[in-house]
Amino acid sequence: MKIVVSRGLDLSLKGAPKESGFCGKVDPTYVSVDLRPFAPLPLEVKVTPGDQVTAGSPLAEYKLFSGVFITSPVDGEVVEIRRGNKRALLEIVIKKKPGISQTKFSYDLQSLTQKDLLEVFKKEGLFALFKQRPFDIPALPTQSPRDVFINLADNRPFTPSVEKHLSLFSSKEDGYYIFVVGVQAIAKLFGLKPHIISTDRLTLPTQDLVSIAHLHTIDGPFPSGSPSTHIHHIARIRNERDVVFTISFQEVLSIGHLFLKGFVLGQQIVALAGSALPPSQRKYLITAKGASFSDLLPKDIFSSDEITLISGDPLTGRLCKKEENPCLGMRDHTITLLPNPKTRESFSFLRLGWNKLTVTRTYLSGFFKRKRVFMDMDTNMHGEKRPIIDAEIYERVSAIPVPVALIIKALETQNFEEACRLGLLEVAPEDFALPTFIDPSKTEMFSIVKESLLRYAKENVVTSS
């Protein structure tokens, strides 16, 4: 199936590393296992500071679903268990042993029954890789998904491409074969043909995939790479019982690597990007999953007060505090560095804005059709919070036809029934990142949706499963 998306916005941000750039290798001293994505689920920590762990060792377990573990990506020693407000679990920090783990696993995918395969996924931390829709929560083992969507079309700013992720392996063919094994495992686990969404520029091993998966391509501006866009065009979610699972290309590689090679895939590709980073430092690295920022960035840049650190891309990433020695998030493959200006731009309201991004023709650049305008992004808000006036501008950049402003208003009044009627079941917080970015009212739509979905999932979805 060929999907063409017309709505959205092509973001050309300054600071992207060169796609042809060489991938250097960094073996970090510290890594962390990010537990924030599991916020709707109560977790039981299985380790204490001082414990020795190996790649694949259980670090935490789902309290409500016994036997589902979150595991360590590396060998090392647990040094800290970080908690936030109300003792909420944030991450488990590990002092990594040098080198790659040699802990060997032996699973024969062909001989495993579906029931045995599920136990392997739960035990080895593979089930924790899936996300569940609606409500964008960690996948629950009590649910049987209607469909599984595998995303190979992620086009968030600065996110490494599929080709870059294949740099982890000796050859592109080797990487694709590992991916095929991962797809085979998913198809057998759930007894269905998963949907694989890629772009036209990718050359997939279709002869190996066509019998075990549905293949689709998508074309269009950001956010055409969003799983919500794929689900909407291929098989829409129409009610709360319409459960689907989503998973990324990199996570399928982790599944295939365990079954084919017998080792935990503890490495990942990371992009160092952002306009605050000198061009010579913008690059791709091969490093451990959850690596600490201080091991990947030059000391003078990491400690600078004029730079904002983000784990992930600039639109959906997590703001990090330097004093907490931040590490990469669970699903993050980018470290973004943005300038943090201390003063506002003088007479900004009088400037023509030839190189400023606008979707409302506030600046001169909005009246000229140029193929690409490279925007120099920083953390300046360029104004204060205002009431929502023009609700139509959000629909211009939303790839899914949902009334963005009405959903936000329903969520702010905690009217979930109305929000679901308007289309909340089809979306995730990341789908509101672009409307938040272009919003003249400065409303934090991304945060509103994220917190509302978390609250609703805790009270209604997780406890009833």
Swiss-Prot record:
Pfam families: NQRA_2nd, NQRA_N, NQRA_SLBB. Belongs to the NqrA family. Its EC number is 7.2.1.1. GO terms for biological process: sodium ion transport. InterPro entries: NqrA, NQRA_2nd, NqrA_C_domain, NQRA_N. Keywords: Ion transport, NAD, Sodium, Sodium transport, Translocase, Transport, Ubiquinone. PANTHER family: NA(+)-TRANSLOCATING NADH-QUINONE REDUCTASE SUBUNIT A. It comes from the Bacteria. This is Na(+)-translocating NADH-quinone reductase subunit A. HAMAP family: NqrA (MF_00425). It catalyses: a ubiquinone + n Na(+)(in) + NADH + H(+) = a ubiquinol + n Na(+)(out) + NAD(+). It comes from Chlamydia trachomatis serovar L2 (strain ATCC VR-902B / DSM 19102 / 434/Bu). NQR complex catalyzes the reduction of ubiquinone-1 to ubiquinol by two successive reactions, coupled with the transport of Na(+) ions from the cytoplasm to the periplasm. NqrA to NqrE are probably involved in the second step, the conversion of ubisemiquinone to ubiquinol. One of its GO terms (molecular function) is oxidoreductase activity, acting on NAD(P)H, quinone or similar compound as acceptor. Composed of six subunits; NqrA, NqrB, NqrC, NqrD, NqrE and NqrF. The keyword Ion transport applies.
